[in-house]
Amino acid sequence: MRDAANLCWKLAAVLRGQAPDSLLDSYAAERKPHVTEVTRRAVLVGRIITERRPWLAAIRNHVVRALTRIPGANAVGQKFWWIPEAHYDDGFFAAAHPALGRQIPQPTVDGVPLDDLLGGRWTLMHTGAVPVGAAAWAAAGAATLQITEPSLVRWLADHKADAVVLRPDGFVYAAASSGGRLPAPPAGLNLTTLTGAPA
């Protein structure tokens, strides 16, 4: 799913003539490390599951049984073993900031899933006053959303941001701390029509 989400909006931008072909080069830079890590974890878990030496299999079975008795251990284990954090170290992003390349959490906002609220659009999300540089994003066609939902406010604070600009795939393209200026929108992209929806 993340592969499709990453590639869909980029292909749409290139096919609509809204972005250069070079935008597609960011796909491998962003996705390859994540896929490599998922594969590494799957191989490791596979080795644990298929262990045939009786003494190691007995230890494995004992540990797994013990862990299943701990409330919440299954959810934590799935995240630890299977699903690496959605974070890109390299790719199509603005100037450096701790929030860049991270996927925004997906809570429900006023009874609506955040994904549905964002609608696959470029979106400027902020917690307080409209940040410096927001006018350029609005002029380029990005939606603006002031957030008060506690988990989103906490997530932004944890990543030292009062405002973030989300790409259509829900990853942070740009961010600004309190009183900071948002970087300018990417040149040449028409953010009004550039969404994660099919062309």
Identify the residue ranges that each predicted region occupies:
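Extended, hydrophobic alpha-helical segments in both membrane/secreted and soluble proteins
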Residues: 1-12, 23
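Helical substrate-recognition/capping region of FAD-dependent monooxygenase/halogenase enzymes
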Residues: 13-199
